[in-house]
């Protein structure tokens, strides 16, 4: 397994809309290795979710594990939200927008259809942190970032803060 480089805002590749994955590709050794590498990258970061777009792979899938013990890995391939209910404000962060956190309102519970790691059709009802994480990662697959939900003024403040952070690292 290998760690993958994570793209960071304002990299324009984060705005790429991911393409659907052919079901036949899911069980290939190359795809399975990519999934393993994404989990390793996510756990190492550390994070609770990682969309393929964030590692410059523009295919419609993501890996998530919101458990404290990091023992409940989920792979969502070609995910589609088929039902939403309620609203909840959650403070979100992102591996592609390091050090920035902001309140975002999302559906409280969702039902998502997807292919699992074995290419089997699944449907999951998710709530709380898992629902938030699924919606956040699905935004990545559509070329959206959580900071897009902020006002233009706050988004510009984020851009300046990240530029300043990069200057101190260099």
UniProtKB/Swiss-Prot annotation:
Cite a single GO MF annotation. Answer: metal ion binding
Q: Which residues form the active site?
A: 137
Keywords in alphabetical order, please: Hydrolase, Iron, Metal-binding, Protein biosynthesis
Q: Is the Metal-binding keyword given for this protein? A: yes
Q: Which reaction does it catalyse?
A: N-terminal N-formyl-L-methionyl-[peptide] + H2O = N-terminal L-methionyl-[peptide] + formate
Checking Pfam families in the record gives: Pep_deformylase
Q: Name one GO biological process term.
A: translation
Query: Binding of Fe cation: at which residues?
Result: 94, 136, 140
Quote the function comment for this protein: Removes the formyl group from the N-terminal Met of newly synthesized proteins. Requires at least a dipeptide for an efficient rate of reaction. N-terminal L-methionine is a prerequisite for activity but the enzyme has broad specificity at other positions.
The protein here is known as Peptide deformylase
């Amino acid at each position: 397994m290998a760690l993958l480089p994570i793209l960071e805002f304002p990299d324009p590749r984060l705005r790429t809309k991911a393409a659907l994955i052919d079901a036949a590709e899911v069980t290939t050794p190359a795809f399975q290795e990519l999934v393993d590498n994404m989990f390793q990258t996510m756990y190492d970061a550390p994070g609770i979710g990682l969309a393929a777009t964030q590692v410059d792979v523009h295919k419609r899938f993501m890996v998530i594990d919101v458990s404290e013990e990091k023992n409940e890995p989920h792979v969502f391939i070609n995910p589609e939200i088929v039902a939403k209910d309620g609203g909840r404000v959650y403070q979100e962060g992102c591996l592609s927008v390091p050090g920035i956190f902001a309140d975002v309102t999302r559906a409280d519970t969702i039902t998502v259809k997807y292919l699992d790691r074995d290419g089997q059709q699944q449907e999951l009802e998710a709530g709380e942190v898992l629902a938030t994480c699924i919606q956040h990662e699905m935004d990545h697959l559509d070329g959206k970032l959580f900071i897009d939900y902020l006002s233009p003024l706050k988004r510009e403040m984020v851009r300046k803060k990240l530029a300043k952070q990069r200057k101190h690292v260099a």
